Swiss-Prot record:
Domain of life: Bacteria
Organism field: Parasynechococcus marenigrum (strain WH8102)
PANTHER family in alphabetical order: DEHYDRODOLICHYL DIPHOSPHATE SYNTHASE 2, DEHYDRODOLICHYL DIPHOSPHATE SYNTHASE FAMILY MEMBER
Known partners and oligomeric status: Homodimer.
GO molecular function, one term: magnesium ion binding
Catalytic activity, EC: 2.5.1.-
Name of the protein this chain belongs to: Isoprenyl transferase
NCBIfam families named among the record's database cross-references: PRK14830.1, PRK14831.1, uppS
Class of enzymatic activity (EC top level): transferase
Length: 260
């Protein structure tokens, strides 16, 4: 990346955060559905692949902003289990793009203390990409900066089925009593185990759906939808999303504290 991701040692996130935002009321964990790459390219008379390239730059910028502004975790929906149904040349391009970006950016991620994890059924990915993912995960595991989760070959329903199978296997082996299965034990079997659930979901391109993304984890997340295509998502768009988040009263199923 051309600029540092994480906050420098002599500058605090509160100093970098836009003054319109309350630095004490930022979401801890932001999730993004990066939609609109193809339409962004088509609107400019470009191949869809160019939209994906531009989308990578938007993701790099968003990661940098989240780190600088004091957001602890960013989870991005990069490639869903349904995306395999796209044209083969587009899928192949995306796999190659993932490989090239990892090879190019890993050193910077290490230097800036970003901890990166890839969430999903990774065994179905090309072998070279699997190796790069394993290397990146291992080399950044001890980093204490922003947590960057990249959902790759990920599907929320498949994740829940996988978790249920793992719990069933434990019960069948006598390691877990069925009546002891609770929310915590199921959450521990999800790809996101150990990560706080997202406080805010941002979806670009104006689509109002969650597309099989983090079905369990988004139970109490605030949702912000913007008409901006993902390649055009920038600091102003992120600030608007965070202002929207800070305008909400999060009740988690209860009453507003101000309600008599």
């Amino acid at each position: 990346m051309s600029r540092p991701l994480a906050t420098s040692h002599d500058t605090t996130p509160s100093q970098l955060c836009p003054p319109e935002l309350d630095g004490d009321r930022l979401p801890v964990h932001v999730a993004v559905i990066m939609d609109g790459n193809g339409r962004w390219a088509e609107a400019r008379g470009l191949p869809r692949m160019m939209g994906h390239r531009a989308g990578v730059e938007a993701l790099k910028s968003t990661l940098r902003l989240c780190s600088d502004w004091g957001i602890a975790a960013l989870t991005a929906y990069a490639f869903s289990t349904e995306n395999w149904s796209r044209p083969g040349d587009e899928v192949n391009f995306l796999m190659t793009l993932f490989e090239r970006v990892l090879q190019k950016e890993l050193r910077t991620l290490e230097e800036e203390q970003v901890r990166i994890r890839f969430l999903g059924d990774l065994d179905a990915l090309p072998l070279k990409l699997q190796e790069l993912i394993g290397d990146a995960t291992e080399r950044t595991a001890a980093n204490d900066g922003i947590h960057f989760n990249v959902c790759t070959n990920y599907g929320g329903r498949r994740e829940l089925v996988r978790a249920a199978q793992r719990l069933a296997r434990q019960a069948a082996n006598g390691d877990l009593m069925p009546e002891d299965i609770d929310e915590n034990s199921l959450a521990a079997e999800l790809f996101t185990a150990g990560e706080q659930d997202p406080d805010l979901l941002i979806r670009t391109s104006g689509e109002h759906r969650i597309s099989n993304f983090l079905l369990w984890q988004l139970a109490y997340a605030e949702i912000h939808v913007t008409d901006v295509f993902w390649p055009d998502f920038n600091a102003e768009a992120l600030k608007r999303a965070l202002l929207d988040f800070q305008s909400r009263s999060r009740r988690f199923g209860g009453l507003d504290p101000l309600t008599p």
